[in-house]
Amino acid sequence: MSVTVAVGMFDGLHRGHLALFERSLARAQSGRCVAISFDPHPDVVLAKEFRALAPLTPLPEKHAFLARRGIELHVVPFTRELAALTPEEFVEVHLRAPFAPDWLVVGEDFALGRGRSGNVERLRSIGQEAGFEVESVPLLSLHGSAVTSTRIREALSLGQVAQAAELLGRRYRLLGTVVHGDKIGRTLGYPTANLRLHDEKLVPAHGIYAVWSRLAGEARWRPAAMSVGVRPTFGGVVRTLEVHLLDWEGDLYGQDVEVAFVDHLRPELRFDSREALIEAMAQDIIHTRQRLTAAVPEPPGDA
């Protein structure tokens, strides 16, 4: 049985990554297709000073996403010792010994090993000795720039969730469990579900968003407005994720809820009165309905 291995961080599993996986599956044909990724992110390990970097795609999500496409995920712990390996050592320990691949598929700008010396040209040379061929997949460009995880991070950090969706090829999602909050939304006439995320994941910028929401075990997406922020009107300092499901009533405590970001409505604001906040929330609901009318929900398994 033939074996094809793709190597990369694959954070975000964006359109560029999907193009690479398409080539990997084509090379594998009916054989085994493996994706090697790393955890934690190399930028966290190699940074001179501590750097927090929440992933775009937590490992459980990455496993599920690839499994649905017939790809096995193999996670290599990223350490300074791993980064110090020569390309030949990396290939022997993490490619040839466990998988004996027939094909290695990487992006055209990919490099591994000490000092990132294992570029495509060197990997092809190593492959001739180790018995595998190398295919490099061109970077995918959109609006004049390469599709990268960095671009997606930048878009989300600015609240540009529609742009992030264009780069990803699907809407950015968060999954969490509904926990008890202080029920401020209920006193304002807009009860919200407070989400505690299952896994560490990058959260878009503070603000109000139009989202599709889905309850665990359901295929149906429900329209919702979401607040990401600290609730400055009430002197908050801790970030909360609050979802108001439109035209829905019920007890959500303890249930899992997934949200898919459609559009950014406005930044988080501090209001001078509860009345002003309530009026703004009413407008948020109107704008949410307008945005979602033109935004068809994606299939539940598309994440």
Located regions from the model:
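N-terminal catalytic cores of NTP/NDP-binding nucleotidyl/phosphoryl-transfer enzymes
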Residues: 1-58
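Residues at the starts of beta-strands that form the adenosine-phosphate
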Residues: 32-34, 72, 102, 133
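A conserved beta-strand->alpha-helix junction
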Residues: 36-40, 73-82, 138
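A short acidic, helix-capping loop that chelates divalent metal ions and anchors anionic groups
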Residues: 42-48, 109, 146-147, 269
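Glycine-rich, highly charged phosphate/nucleotide-binding loops
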Residues: 53-62, 83-91
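ATP-dependent adenylation/nucleotidyltransferase module used to activate substrates
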Residues: 64-67
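Classical nucleotidyltransferase
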Residues: 82-191, 272-280, 302
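Phosphate/ribose-recognition catalytic cores of enzymes acting on nucleotide-derived substrates
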Residues: 181-303
